[in-house]
């Protein structure tokens, strides 16, 4: 995937799935991702809403954006978007939770039109580069 393809992917995600946030309860979209660096060291996956257009720079995502820190596009190894994600709010005297659906089938159709290779299953849409 080129930087331009990643930008197209993330812009289509925001258009189809909605605005992302670091907190699932405030997010219309959700994903998990890892990097080649993480795969070679500790195999860590991060999770947050999908980046907004303002989070996308020429070589990667911005610092302090939806993902909280910068990630180079060339280092992204695996991005997973679930069809459904769980959210909760836990505060003193308040507990709310639920799930949100993500129309990954519609996203898949847009990605096909844009020439972005991906995999769609009943549970997830993913881009896996390893």
Model-derived segments and their meaning:
Residues 125-129:
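Minor-groove-contacting beta-hairpin "wing" of winged helix-turn-helix DNA-binding domains
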Residues 1-120, 130:
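Structured alpha/beta or helical-core interaction and ligand-binding surfaces enriched in interleaved
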């Amino acid at each position: 995937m080129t930087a331009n393809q990643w930008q197209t992917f993330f812009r289509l995600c925001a258009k189809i799935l909605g605005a992302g946030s670091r907190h699932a309860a405030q997010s219309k979209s959700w994903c998990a991702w890892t990097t080649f660096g993480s795969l070679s060291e500790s195999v860590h996956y991060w999770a947050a809403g999908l980046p907004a257009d303002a989070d996308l720079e020429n070589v990667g995502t911005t610092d302090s954006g939806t993902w909280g820190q910068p990630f180079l596009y060339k280092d992204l190894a695996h991005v997973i978007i679930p069809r459904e994600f769980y959210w909760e709010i836990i505060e003193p005297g308040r507990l709310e939770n639920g799930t949100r659906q993500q129309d990954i089938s519609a996203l898949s159709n847009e990605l096909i039109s844009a020439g972005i290779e991906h995999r769609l299953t009943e549970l997830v849409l993913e881009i896996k580069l390893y």
